[in-house]
Amino acid sequence: MAIELYSQREIEKIRKASQIVAEVLHIVAENVKPGVSTWDLEMIARKETEKRGAKPAFLGYKPPFSDVRYPAALCISINDEVVHGLPKKEKVIKEGDVVSIDFGAIYDGYAGDSAITVIAGKGSPEAQKLLEATKEALYNAIEKALPGKKVGDITKAIHETAEKYGFKTILRYGGHGVGRKVHQEPFVPNNVKDIGKKNPRLRQGMVIAIEPMLSIGTEETVEDGDGWTVKTKDGSLAAHFEHTVAITKKGPVILTEL
């Protein structure tokens, strides 16, 4: 599938969807507290999305790697869960949990996608360092989202930041194009081993989701028994941050920032 380039008018539409994503994600993150279930957060996200006249992008979405549709608006991954954690009534957040929330929305035919990781209550120094590193990796990567650079330059920025902190970047998972759909070409890897021969050049008009996923212990993952949740293979903590970014002649523009 070809990489789509968007006009300024289309990027403004993606920005509107992305701003809804940012607002909803902010509200959900504020409600991450010990004793709250991940299903409670799911209900907040659905209500806030509907209030803004948008639709959750993940709810009912069938990704290429699955035979079934995703049954929720949010992906909520806790502690050793990296991505695609299913919200559940019985999944109750505890003090010190590292909680990653990934959310996408569609508004007026265009999508936005973002993720944030927060700590419920007071977290360990190690968890706080992991969040700091992952967030830094995101912004270092965004700086490389310039016309003429390659996707792999974004990957290297993520990888080098992780290495500086002594952390790992997750293999086989990463960012992607965003626009008319929530997931488009190109794939934007987090781990340099995934760059490969397909390393497209960035061009003005591309819109991509950059989403570092770091772990304290390993780059390898395993799938949980629910068919969705991806965990670190060694059970170590993971964190995930994401922004939707437009590549313009003036530089990267973060569309999912409030």
Swiss-Prot record:
Residues bound to a divalent metal cation 2: D113, H176, E211, E242
InterPro entries (alphabetical): Creatinase/aminopeptidase-like, Pept_M24, Pept_M24_MAP, Pept_M24A_MAP1
Cited Pfam families: Peptidase_M24
SUPFAM superfamilies for the chain: Creatinase/aminopeptidase
Gene Ontology MF term list: initiator methionyl aminopeptidase activity; metal ion binding; metalloaminopeptidase activity
Residues annotated to bind a divalent metal cation 1: D102, D113, E242
GO CC entries: cytosol
EC number, UniProt record: 3.4.11.18
Leading EC class: hydrolase
Keyword annotations: Aminopeptidase, Hydrolase, Metal-binding, Protease
Cystine bridges: none
Catalyzed reaction equations: Release of N-terminal amino acids, preferentially methionine, from peptides and arylamides
Necessary cofactors: Co(2+); Zn(2+); Mn(2+); Fe(2+)
Record-level GO BP terms: proteolysis
Described function: Removes the N-terminal methionine from nascent proteins. The N-terminal methionine is often cleaved when the second residue in the primary sequence is small and uncharged (Met-Ala-, Cys, Gly, Pro, Ser, Thr, or Val). Requires deformylation of the N(alpha)-formylated initiator methionine before it can be hydrolyzed.
Family annotation (NCBIfam families): met_pdase_I
UniProt xrefs under PANTHER family: METHIONINE AMINOPEPTIDASE
Subunit structure comment from the entry: Monomer.
Name of the protein in its database record: Methionine aminopeptidase
Origin organism lineage: Bacteria, Pseudomonadati, Aquificota, Aquificia, Aquificales
Recorded name of the encoding gene: map
